[in-house]
A protein has these predicted regions:
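Alpha-helical tetratricopeptide repeat
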Residues: 1-274
């Protein structure tokens, strides 16, 4: 699929070699084929072709970020924002750079900017919530998780993570409720049973705690047996279901994002904080 796409872009570029997006798309195709050298060359050519297009800088910055070349990534995201001060994805990506280089307050400021420009972006709320949790700002983290639950109600991780914040704040019953919500969405979620069991001990519910421990142990044993099972493919549906539960409705709004190229509208660039 991507090799055919590269052939098509080659033909187009032979006829029209002044279209930056063609080089960006060809670079993305190489990136999907794990050819980072040619991807980088194409992003460079896109930038030389149109130095005012933020997409070229953002794509090259994304490649630098992927390769943990944070200084170069930051410079590219800065340039993209200089080209278009409302280019959300570069604020988002620069926040990832700031987080990776231990600058949480600057990362928060960039996530704030993304949300200011796109107030329903659940993945940005989720990342900001995790960052706020890391710095101990639990109440604001809860507010962000509430937004994620509003915009992506079937995302299992929001309930799991929010439960941890409630537990930190001593709101044990609400934490149990969230672990229960996570389990309803994904009944094989062993960790959710483990943590709910511990909290049930605190709530003087030894029977419930024992049941959760037992279920967790069974789920873990089942998972391990699947890993060793030659018919593992029969369990693929469960894995795919979990992947779907982790998905976010994270389509960015705004004019700049309408220009993003890529096989799913740019979603593949957005990522969770590590």
């Amino acid at each position: 699929q991507f090799k055919e796409a590269i052939d098509d872009f080659d033909k187009f570029i032979r006829q029209e070699n002044k279209v930056a997006d063609a080089f960006i798309c060809r670079g993305l195709s190489y990136l999907h084929l794990k050819d980072t050298t040619r991807a980088y060359e194409n992003f460079n050519t896109a930038i030389r072709t149109n130095r005012e297009n933020p997409n070229g800088y953002n794509r090259r910055g994304g490649l630098h970020l992927q390769q943990e070349q944070y200084k170069e990534a930051e410079a590219d995201f800065n340039k993209a924002i200089e080209c278009d001060s409302a280019y959300l994805l570069s604020y988002f990506n620069r926040a990832l750079v700031y987080n990776a280089t231990n600058r949480p307050m600057q990362a928060l400021a960039d996530f704030d900017k993304v949300i200011q420009l796109d107030s329903t972006n659940s993945l940005t709320y989720f990342n900001r919530a995790m960052l706020r949790t890391q710095i101990g700002d639990y109440n604001h983290a809860l507010e962000d998780y509430d937004k994620v639950a509003l915009y992506s109600p079937n995302n299992v991780l929001v309930y799991y993570n929010r439960a941890g914040v409630y537990a930190q704040l001593g709101e044990i019953e609400r934490a149990v409720e969230d672990y229960t919500s996570a389990i309803k969405l994904y009944p094989d979620f062993a960790n959710a049973y483990i943590y709910r069991g511990r909290l049930r001990e605190l709530l003087r519910d030894p029977q419930g705690a024992k049941e959760d421990r037992s279920i967790a142990q069974r789920k873990i044993a089942e998972y391990r047996s699947r890993l060793n099972d030659s018919t593992y493919s029969i369990y693929a549906d469960t894995t795919q279901r979990f992947d779907r539960l982790l998905s976010f409705d994270s389509k960015f709004a705004g004019g700049s994002f309408d220009r993003i190229t890529g096989h799913n509208g740019g979603h593949e660039e957005m990522r969770l904080l590590p």
